[in-house]
Amino acid sequence: MPIVQVHLLEGRSTEQKKMLVSEMTASICLALEVRPEQVRIILSEISHGDYAVGGELFSEKKS
């Protein structure tokens, strides 16, 4: 049973997450020759204040 964990910044819509897990499941099934009901996907959303790039919090990053 494949278990995949995805970390992503908060802000994606439910529809986007549904599409993501659907596409990932299809790819995993194809690559690993498993059934969709065997695939587990964990989405972990990270707030912008809990993520840093180049030593700067993403929430404080200038565009």
Task: Provide a role label for each language-model segment.
Residues 2-63:
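A domain-level signal for the structural core that forms small-molecule/cofactor-binding pockets
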